From Swiss-Prot:
One of its GO terms (cellular component) is excinuclease repair complex. Belongs to the UvrB family. It comes from Bordetella pertussis (strain Tohama I / ATCC BAA-589 / NCTC 13251). This is UvrABC system protein B. A motif (Beta-hairpin) lies at residues 101-124. It comes from the Bacteria. Keywords: ATP-binding, Cytoplasm, DNA damage, DNA excision, DNA repair, Excision nuclease, Nucleotide-binding, SOS response. GO terms for biological process: nucleotide-excision repair; SOS response.
C-alpha cells in the first residue's frame, strides 16, 4: 500500500492529501466523472453506497480538475461532517463553510385573524458569520477553494459587484489620509471601539489603526501611517499583541455581505420613495387607510436610517432597490460569487433537491401577508430564496451524489456512475424478513446478543408514540437505550450519536433515522419495525437508506419486521442483494478480505459542534501531565475553570468537551490510585 502523502496534479492549485490510494470502485468512478466534466456534461450522478468513500471521490475529482467547488448538503450536521473530511483532504487549500448563521430565527410575520404582528427576532452565530465572510473572500481571491454549504446558499446575500467594489486595498508606501481610512472602514460597516476589540471592529491610536477583519478567525491588522503614507502593515494576535507577520499588501473586505456604496444607497432611496408613493395611492384608493398609514410610517423611518447610516434594520427587504434589479428578478446569492467554471456537488441529492424547490413557496406566502397589510412594500417579495428553475439556470457543471437517486436526478443525469464496491471490502448487510406480530420480543433477544459483543443497534419505528413506548419497554428490560426525535437540536443530536458510538448506550430508537446522515461503524444491526406499512417512511428509497446504516460493520445485518412483502420491500431487498453480490464477486476476484471500519469519534467543526472531549487524555491533555501528580492536579483545576467559563458564555458544546476531558482525567486518577483533593 502507498504511504500517505500529498498528491498534486498538472495545472491544479490543489494539494490533495491521500491517506490511502483510491480503491474498490473509486478509481473507475473518479476517472468516469472527471472525463464527463472534461467532455462538458452538465449533470452526472454518482450512485455511491454508504461507506464507499463518496467524499474521497469528490475530493479526488476536485484536485484533478483544479477548479473551485461548491458541495451542498441537506443539513448542518452533514455539512459539518463533509467540511471536516474536506479539511483533512485539503489542509493546504481554502476549505470553507457556508450555512445559515442563525442559531435562532423568528421571521417577521403578521397573523390577520388575531391582528398580531411578530417582529423579526434572531440570534446570529458569530463564528459561522465569520466563516461565511471567509467563504466569499476565498472565492474572490483564490482558485483553490472548496465551499461546503447547505440550501442557505440560495438565499439572497449582497451583490458581488457592490461587495467587491467596497474592498479596501492597502499597500505599504501608498498615500492615504487617516481620515479617509476611517471613513472607508465605517462605510464598510466596521465600527470603532477603542476598548472592546472584536471581529468587525477597528481602534485608533494616533497614527496607528488596528483593524479586526470580519472574516478573520484570529488575526488582526495593524496599519501604521506617517505623514499620510502607509509606513507598515502587520498581522498580529489581538489577545497577546504579538506581531505574526509583516505584509507588503493587505485587502480588507467589508464587514457584511449587505454592504453597499453610498451612491447606490442614495439611488435606492429615490426608487423606494417612488414605490412608496405608488403603493400608498393604491392602498388609499382601496380604502385601506390603516395599512397606508402603517406602511408610510415604517418605510419613512427606514429611509431616514438609510440616509443617515447607509443601512437599516431589515435592509434585506429593500435588496431589489439596492441591487438595481427589475421586479421579479432573483436576488444575488452565493452562487453568483462562484466562477463560471466552478464544480457543484449535491450530496444526498434525493433530499437536497427537494429542499431547493420548497424554500421559495413557504417564504412567499408569509411575505404576501406582510405586503397586503401594509407592513412591507411589494418589493420585499423579491428578497427571497431562488426558485428551483432559477437555481437550475445558475448551476455549474454538477454531480448528484446519492445512494438512492430520485426522479429528478434520473431525468437530468447525462451519465450515471456506480460506486458500489467499498475500499474496505465491506459488503452490504444481510437482509432478513421476520414476522411483525412478534417483533418486539424478537428484537429484545437480538439486542442482548449485540450488546454482549459491544455492538450497537438502530431501531426505526413508524410513529413518535411507538418510539416512546418501545424506548420505555427496552429500558424496563435493562437495555441501555436512547430516543432520537425531531425536537432534539443539532448539537444534542450529534452528542447522542457520539455517545452511541462511545458505548454510553447500546440502542438508538428513532422514526426517520436515515435523514440524520448517520455514520456509525459500531452499528451491526438495523431493525425496521412494521416494514410492510407502505408509505413515505417505508418507501424503497427510505428502506435502502436505513438498511445502509448497518453497511459499515463487518457483521452488518438488517431485519425487516413484516407480515407481507410489499413492492417497496421487494425492490429494496433486490437492490441490496444486487449490490452485495457485486461486492462479494469483486472481493473474490481480487482476493480481498473485508475489514471493519475503525473511525475516530472526532469533532465535526469548531463553533458548530463541540471539539471532541472523548479520548480527551490524548486530545486535550498534554502527555507529560499524565505522569506527574502535581501537573494532573493543576490540569484538573484548569479544565474546571475552562468548563465554567464556557458555560458562563453559553458555549455549551465547548463546556461539554471540557467536562468530558475532566471526567477522563479524574477516571485516570482513580484507575492509577493517585490521590487528589480539590
Amino acid at each position: 500500500m502507498t504511504a500517505p502523502g500529498f498528491v498534486e496534479f498538472p495545472d491544479s492549485p490543489f494539494h490533495l492529501y491521500q491517506p490511502y490510494p483510491p480503491a474498490g470502485d473509486q478509481p473507475g468512478a473518479i476517472d468516469a466523472l472527471t472525463e464527463g466534466v472534461s467532455d462538458g456534461l452538465m449533470f452526472q450522478t454518482l450512485l455511491g453506497v454508504t461507506g464507499s468513500g463518496k467524499t474521497y471521490t469528490m475530493a479526488n475529482m476536485i484536485a484533478r480538475l483544479g477548479r473551485p467547488a461548491l458541495v451542498l448538503a441537506p443539513n448542518k450536521t452533514l455539512a459539518a461532517q463533509l467540511y471536516a473530511e474536506m479539511r483533512e483532504f485539503f489542509p493546504r487549500n481554502a476549505v470553507e463553510y457556508f450555512v445559515s448563521y442563525y442559531d435562532y430565527y423568528q421571521p417577521e410575520a403578521y397573523v390577520p385573524t388575531r391582528d398580531l404582528f411578530i417582529e423579526k427576532d434572531s440570534s446570529i452565530n458569530e463564528h459561522i458569520e465569520q466563516m461565511r465572510l471567509s467563504a466569499t473572500k476565498s472565492l474572490l481571491e483564490r482558485r483553490d477553494t472548496v465551499i461546503v454549504g447547505t440550501v442557505s446558499c440560495i438565499y439572497g446575500i449582497g451583490n458581488p459587484g457592490d461587495y467587491h467594489a467596497m474592498v479596501l486595498i492597502l499597500r505599504t508606501g501608498d498615500r492615504i489620509s487617516r481620515r479617509e481610512v476611517l471613513a472607508r472602514l465605517v462605510a464598510m460597516q466596521y465600527t470603532r471601539n477603542d476598548a472592546d476589540f472584536t471581529r468587525g471592529v477597528f481602534r485608533v491610536r494616533c497614527e496607528t489603526i488596528d483593524i479586526f477583519p470580519a472574516e478573520s478567525p484570529e488575526l488582526a491588522l495593524r496599519l501604521t501611517l506617517f505623514d499620510d503614507e502607509i509606513e507598515s502593515l502587520e498581522l498580529f494576535d489581538p489577545l497577546t499583541g504579538r506581531v505574526r507577520q509583516k505584509l507588503p499588501r493587505f485587502t480588507v473586505y467589508p464587514g457584511s455581505h449587505y454592504v453597499t456604496p453610498r451612491e447606490t444607497v442614495l439611488r435606492a432611496i429615490e426608487t423606494i420613495k417612488e414605490e412608496l408613493r405608488e403603493r400608498l395611492a393604491q392602498l388609499i384608493a382601496d380604502g385601506k387607510l390603516v395599512e397606508a398609514q402603517r406602511l408610510e410610517q415604517r418605510t419613512r423611518f427606514d429611509l431616514e436610517m438609510l440616509q443617515e447610516l447607509g443601512f437599516c434594520k431589515g435592509i434585506e427587504n429593500y435588496s431589489r432597490h439596492l441591487s438595481g434589479a427589475a421586479p421579479g428578478e432573483p436576488p444575488p446569492t452565493l452562487i453568483d460569487y462562484l466562477p463560471a467554471d466552478a464544480l457543484m456537488f449535491i450530496d444526498e441529492s434525493h433530499v437536497t433537491i427537494g429542499q431547493l424547490g420548497g424554500m421559495y413557496r413557504g417564504d412567499r406566502s408569509r411575505k404576501e401577508t406582510l405586503v397586503q397589510y401594509g407592513f412591507r412594500l411589494p418589493s420585499a417579495l423579491d428578497n427571497r430564496p431562488l426558485r428551483l428553475e432559477e437555481f437550475e439556470a445558475r448551476m455549474r457543471q454538477c454531480v448528484f451524489v446519492s445512494a438512492t437517486p430520485a426522479a429528478y436526478e434520473q431525468e437530468h443525469a447525462d451519465n450515471v456512475v456506480e460506486q458500489v464496491v467499498r475500499p474496505t471490502g465491506l459488503v452490504d448487510p444481510i437482509v432478513e424478513v421476520r414476522p411483525a406480530h412478534t417483533q418486539v420480543d424478537d428484537l429484545l433477544g437480538e439486542i442482548h446478543k449485540r450488546a454482549a459483543l459491544q455492538e450497537r443497534v438502530l431501531v426505526t419505528t413508524l410513529t413518535k408514540r411507538m418510539a416512546e413506548d418501545l424506548t420505555d419497554f427496552l429500558s424496563e428490560h435493562g437495555v441501555r437505550v436512547r430516543y432520537l426525535h425531531s425536537d432534539i437540536d443539532t448539537v444534542e443530536r450529534v452528542e447522542i450519536i457520539r455517545d452511541l458510538r462511545l458505548g454510553v448506550f447500546d440502542v438508538l430508537v428513532g422514526i426517520n433515522l436515515l435523514r440524520e446522515g448517520l455514520d456509525i461503524p459500531e452499528v451491526s444491526l438495523v431493525a425496521i419495525l412494521d416494514a410492510d406499512k407502505e408509505g413515505f417512511l417505508r418507501s424503497e428509497r427510505s428502506l435502502i437508506q436505513t438498511i445502509g446504516r448497518a453497511a459499515r460493520n463487518l457483521n452488518g445485518r438488517a431485519i425487516l419486521y413484516a407480515d407481507r412483502i410489499t413492492d417497496s420491500m421487494r425492490r429494496a431487498i433486490d437492490e441490496t442483494e444486487r449490490r452485495r453480490a457485486k461486492q462479494i464477486q469483486h472481493n473474490t476476484d481480487h482476493g480481498i478480505t473485508a475489514r471493519g471500519v475503525s473511525k475516530a469519534v472526532r469533532e465535526l467543526i469548531d463553533g458548530v459542534v463541540a471539539p471532541a472531549g472523548h479520548d480527551a487524555l490524548e486530545s486535550a491533555v498534554p502527555a507529560e501531565v499524565l505522569t506527574d501528580e502535581k501537573a494532573m492536579a493543576r490540569e484538573i483545576r484548569r479544565l474546571e475553570k475552562l468548563m465554567m467559563d464556557h458555560a458562563r458564555n453559553l458555549e455549551f458544546e465547548q463546556a461539554a468537551a471540557a467536562r468530558d476531558a475532566l471526567n477522563a482525567l479524574k477516571s485516570r486518577l482513580l484507575l492509577d490510585g493517585v490521590g487528589w483533593s480539590g
